[in-house]
Each structure stands twice: as structure tokens, then as C-alpha cells.
Amino acid sequence: LNETGNQQRADNVTGLLGGSEFRAYLYSQKEPISAGFLMHISIDDFSGINSSCGYDYGDYVLKRVADCMKECISDQQRLYRLVGDQYIIVDLRSHSMEDAAQLEKKISKKIYEFIVSEQYKAVFTVSAGAIDARFALEGYEECRRKFDFSLRYAKAMGKNSFYSFQQEDYNAFLRKEKIISALRCSIAEQ
């Protein structure tokens, strides 16, 4: 809640709308989503920026990263801040995941230009995972699980990585989690 007692829509640091507004935007589509992508972006090792440069500079980085992304997206794309150092770009018109990959490269270049302009006070990269926007038709929670998985997969590939969702990878992840859960249950039952 903000100072007036209303639900806060925009983030105080970046000025971006948040996760609930992102969700509302997906549900507000009059036509079923038939194209596009959702790109989940996170600053790699953001906690290191806060630790070494302080929280005020960390907030400044969050704001400037958002500004860099805003400069890179088109009028048909939307940018939201989810939590912490995580953002999502929504594109409901693109017909290629290659468009998402190209956008991520453009954003990374713009962020590098920001780092140089700050005389390398903090050096960082971003990682991104993208999913087909049509996954939103499966419901918000399932869609969220898939774009969260995509970002985690990108980060597991190493810093400054981009990953385009593959169902086979997700199925393997779910199978592994199911096995781990079964092992935990069998240990707990002993």
C-alpha cells in the first residue's frame, strides 16, 4: 500500500509497473494471445553491487537498467519490474524467438554503455530467459513457472546468458524435481 492507502501500482525505484499489473495486462487481452514472447531478465550478481557500492547505488543501477531497457523496447512492447533485480518484457506481436534474442543483445549493449559511462564503478551483466507468450493461455501460474524456469536455466548457463524455453528441458527439470521429492519423502519415512 502507498501513502494514500491504495495498492501501489508503480515501483518507487524504477517507476515501472509491477507484477500484479503485468498479470492484469495478460488477462486484459481481448483476443487470445497468438504470438509474441515474455522475456524474464535479471541482473547477474546484483547483491555484489549492493555489497560493494551500497544500496543507494544499487537502486541507481536498478533505475538505469530499467531506463536502458526502455530505450531498447518498441512501442508494442511493455516492461515491468517483478521483484528485486528482475524485470519482464512483454511482446504480444513478434512471431520469432529470435526477436527476443536480438532484443536481449541490444539491451546488453545498452547496459554496457551505461557501465562505461559510470567509469566501471560496477561491472555487471544481465541474463534472460524467454518463453512463447502463448503459454499465458495455460494460466498465469503455469506461465510464471515456465518463465521463472527459463531465467534459472539462463543463469545456470553462466552470466550474460540468454535461453529460449524448450519443453524438453522443462520436462527433464520436472522429472528431476519429482525424483528429488521422492527421495526426500523416502528419507523422511525412515
Model regions and ranges:
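Cyclic nucleotide signaling catalytic output domains
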Residues: 79, 106, 110, 120, ...
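Short conserved AdoMet
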Residues: 31, 74, 188
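Short acidic/glycine-rich beta-turn/loop cap or linker motifs at sensory/regulatory domain boundaries
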Residues: 44, 188-189
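GGDEF/GGEEF active-site signature
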Residues: 64-134, 184
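Conserved long alpha-helical elements within nucleotide-processing catalytic cores of c-di-GMP signaling
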Residues: 5-37, 44-70, 80-84, 88-89, ...
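Heptad-repeat alpha-helical coiled-coil signal-transmission segments
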Residues: 1-4, 8, 169
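PAS/PAC or PAS-like capping segment
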Residues: 43-44, 94, 168
